[in-house]
Amino acid sequence: MAEEITKSYLKKKQYSTTRYLEARIKIHQFTKNKHSFHEWILNNFNLSLFEKDKTIKILDIGCGTGVFWKKNSKTLNQYQIDATLTDFTEAMVEKEKENTKEVSANKTFEIADVENLEKYRGQFDIVMCHNVLYHAQDKKKA
């Protein structure tokens, strides 16, 4: 019988290492889109609305392995950014640190649950939360 997908399951089985997420990310290499998934996300932020000499505060909820930041480092490094990068497990946060070394942003790394983010409310110019909400058991809380 299949194990129920709970937070405990996700933490212990799916995201205790980064390999399963990294395998899913590799699927995108077969896309025929002009831009990668991560470039597409960045293009939809419309960073041109922000002045390059002003700090942009970004919260990345469920940052995963930090591949968004790694793939977009050249563009992101043109801006002054204070980034709070969060994920559900320590394994992901450790990989985020490794993958975001090229990004010049002032980075803070935290373990955080998508359903318990009250402390971040109202502090950011941009809040990212891609490919995360389907993990939340209580979607309204998330």
Region locations from a protein language model:
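Conserved class I S-adenosyl-L-methionine
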Residues: 2-53, 67-68
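A short, conserved alpha-helix within the catalytic core of class I
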Residues: 136-142
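Short catalytic micro-motifs in class I SAM-dependent methyltransferases
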Residues: 131-132
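A conserved beta-strand element that flanks and buttresses the S-adenosyl-L-methionine
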Residues: 128
